[in-house]
């Protein structure tokens, strides 16, 4: 359905120009959107329009820089300058001539001597020098071994005298597991301490009567009664109530409103003769239970 335009020509042109500036700001960071548009029009072969007045400027475009040039071939590279002052393979002429023209001072000469000695040294055998075994690798388990003359002295087995006067070695439970059934039974008989002990039974509770009795409260000077079985007023016994003339006036006003007889004692529950009695049910059918 066609509707008349809501904006005039001037406002529509302003909206179009604002949209061009917003789209250019979202894409490019140059300050002149009009010059950027003219540059694109000339590059993209757009219909030629008269150039804008003023000098033409080459605006820098936002693009990635070119990659650096590829490195030269290894044979074309210049030799690394040595410490002797010259370049090339003979650049170490200023150094010590005994080391093949190597660069550096006495420290480098000592290092080269150590490397050469290590390369010319014969490789060690598995047993090492003079028959001494090599050290095990780090992390490997090593078992302690003792020569016969340096074996650790162990204490004699602890035992006790049997009935015949012979000393019987005291065996532990883990040692008796390795013996045959007959020897294990004999060892268990000889060592009663190694047998499984019977767990002690817990001692019975004290059968005597506890001396802590429930707290008793004496009410009104009478006999003692338990708190849980008695109703005690926190604020003491209520004092006798003497109604005033205003209380009796309210009582008769309530009787007139609720249509009930007055009470002789205002602490009594009021009686309503017209109210249905409690637990009055009328059943007009019979239940067929046997």
UniProtKB/Swiss-Prot annotation:
Family annotation (InterPro entries): HEV_TT_vir_Orf2/Gyrovir_Vp2_N
Domain of life of the native organism: Viruses
Start-end of Basic and acidic residues biased regions: 121-130
Stretches with biased composition (Polar residues): 191-200
Pfam families with a match to the protein in the record: TT_ORF2-like
Chain intervals with Low complexity compositional bias: 181-190
Positions of the UniProt region annotated as Disordered: 67-210
Protein name: Uncharacterized ORF2/4 protein
Organism field: Torque teno virus (strain VT416) (TTV)
Lineage: Viruses, Viruses incertae sedis, Anelloviridae, Torque teno virus
């Amino acid at each position: 359905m066609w509707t008349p335009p809501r904006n005039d020509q001037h406002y529509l042109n302003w909206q179009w120009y604002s949209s061009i500036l917003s789209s250019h700001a979202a894409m490019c960071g140059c300050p002149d959107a009009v010059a950027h548009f003219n540059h694109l029009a000339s590059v993209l072969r757009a219909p030629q329009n008269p150039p804008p007045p003023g000098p033409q400027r080459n605006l820098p475009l936002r693009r990635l820089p070119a990659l650096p040039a590829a490195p030269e071939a290894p044979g074309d590279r210049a030799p690394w300058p040595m410490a002797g002052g010259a370049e090339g393979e003979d650049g170490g002429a200023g150094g010590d001539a005994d080391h093949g023209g190597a660069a550096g001072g006495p420290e480098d000469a000592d290092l080269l001597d150590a490397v050469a000695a290590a390369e010319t040294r014969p490789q060690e055998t598995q047993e090492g020098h003079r028959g001494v075994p090599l050290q095990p690798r780090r992390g490997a388990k090593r078992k302690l071994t003792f020569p016969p003359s340096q074996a650790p002295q162990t204490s004699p087995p602890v035992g006790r005298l049997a009935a015949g006067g012979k000393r019987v070695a005291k065996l532990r439970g883990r040692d008796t597991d390795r013996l045959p059934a007959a020897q294990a039974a004999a060892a268990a008989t000889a060592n009663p301490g190694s047998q499984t002990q019977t767990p002690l039974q817990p001692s019975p509770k004290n059968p005597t009567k506890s001396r802590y009795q429930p707290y008793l409260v004496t009410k009104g000077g009478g006999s003692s009664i338990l708190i849980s079985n008695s109703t005690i007023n926190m604020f003491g016994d209520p004092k006798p109530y003497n109604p005033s003339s205003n209380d009796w006036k309210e009582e008769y006003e309530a009787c007139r409103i609720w249509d009930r007889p007055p009470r002789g004692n205002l602490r009594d529950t009021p009686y309503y003769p017209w109210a249905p009695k409690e637990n009055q049910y009328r059943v007009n059918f019979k239940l067929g239970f046997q």
